[in-house]
């Protein structure tokens, strides 16, 4: 079975920290890898933790 990770969907959880030291979570459900790349590239706050779960 050939798997194409670019066609799959992912749930993403990020713990972020702003310039004032405030930490907060962002949740994004059902992202493609392309969507994740855009999200990651556009995140201005520091990523403290990142979790990416493949949706089965």
UniProtKB/Swiss-Prot annotation:
Q: Which UniProt keywords apply?
A: Early protein, Host-virus interaction
Keyword Secreted present in the record's keywords: the answer is no
InterPro entries associated with the record: P56, UDG_Inhib_phi29likevirus
Keyword Nucleotide-binding part of the UniProt annotation: no
Q: Kindly indicate where the leader peptide sits in this chain.
A: none
The record's section on Gene3D superfamilies has: 6.20.250.30
Complex formation: Homodimer. Interacts with host UDG; this interaction inhibits the uracil-DNA glycosylase.
What protein family is recorded? Belongs to the phi29likevirus protein p56 family.
What does it do? Inhibits the host uracil-DNA glycosylase (UDG), an enzyme which removes uracil residues from DNA by the base excision repair. Interacts with host uracil-DNA glycosylase and prevents the latter from binding to DNA. Since the viral DNA polymerase efficiently incorporates dUMP into DNA, the virus needs to prevent the deleterious effect caused by host UDG when it eliminates uracil residues present in the viral genome.
Q: Which protein, by its recorded name, is this?
A: Protein p56
- Name the species this protein comes from: Bacillus phage PZA (Bacteriophage PZA)
Native organism taxonomy: Viruses, Duplodnaviria, Heunggongvirae, Uroviricota, Caudoviricetes
């Amino acid at each position: 079975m050939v798997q194409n990770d670019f066609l799959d969907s992912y749930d993403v959880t990020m713990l972020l920290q702003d310039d004032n030291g405030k930490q907060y979570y962002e949740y994004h459900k059902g992202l493609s890898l392309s969507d994740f790349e855009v999200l990651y590239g556009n995140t201005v706050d520091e990523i403290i933790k990142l979790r990416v779960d493949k949706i089965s």
